[in-house]
Amino acid sequence: MAVKDRYMSKIKQETKPWIKRFGRLGYFAFGGVFILLGVLAFMTAAGAGRAKDSSGALQTLSRMPYGSLLLFFIGIGLIGYVIWMVLSAIKDTEGHGNSRRGLSRRIGNFFSAAVYTSIAWNALRFVFGQGDGGTSEQTWSAYVLAQPFGQWLTGLTGAGFIVFAIVQFMKGVRAAFMKEFDTSKMNKQMICITKNTGRAGNIARAIIFSAIGYFLIKTAMTADPDDTRGFDGALAELAQQPHGKLILSILALGLILYGMYAIMKGIYQHMTWEK
């Protein structure tokens, strides 16, 4: 216990206040992206469009009134989220430690930083009128399949998505994420709201990621990049199943709740190094 206290004390001394504020802003932007994805998925379920991934959602937002201004704040906010994730991976600013589980979470934060760097870049590209130049999942998978051991790499990536989905699902069911919140600053109603939104949101995200993993494994088995589905493709496939519109509506609500959960995490995240 004394060793851990000294470890957290070192983190507390090294973490600058502006970095923590920037990280909180990042969670707000992170949550905003998922709320936008959920709203667009709802529109798809209602027959008013097609499910979109983050790039498609940003493109839609760019065409709305004041969309460029919102995209600017999302882009800057996500840069804050990326910085926070990188620091969490390298400096362990969230105090995960050096155990096997702690290191796996820190590595996961590094990959999360890579993904949201791309989304932040796309958001700012739309702000400056240089968007709509993304590369499709099929193009990427075709490139990977053409490499030595490409099918194995694609299959392992799919398996990674499914493993992540299982972890995310269990995290939602058990409400294990509540350990990340400073509940001393929350009233009972806010704790209840956070727990329920976090549960629903994490489970919804797990279902979508498991679908993406399934299609990647299918791509590896058939060696056909057309079988690959990204975020939007996975939602579109789910919508085509029996009761698909109902399923998509539930997942859309889950994405919105996940966004709300992320915003609350930005407000109440339990930072043990804060005074």
Swiss-Prot record:
Subcellular location: Cell membrane
Membrane disposition: Multi-pass membrane protein
One Pfam family per UniProt: DUF1206
Domain of life of the source: Bacteria
InterPro entries linked to this entry: DUF1206 (IPR009597)
Keyword annotations: Cell membrane, Membrane, Transmembrane, Transmembrane helix
Location (main, coarse): membrane
Transmembrane segments: 25-45, 70-90, 107-127, 149-169, 203-223, 247-267
GO CC, alphabetical: plasma membrane
Annotated signal sequence range: none
Protein name: Uncharacterized protein YxxB
Source organism (scientific name): Bacillus subtilis (strain 168)
Taxonomic path: Bacteria, Bacillati, Bacillota, Bacilli, Bacillales
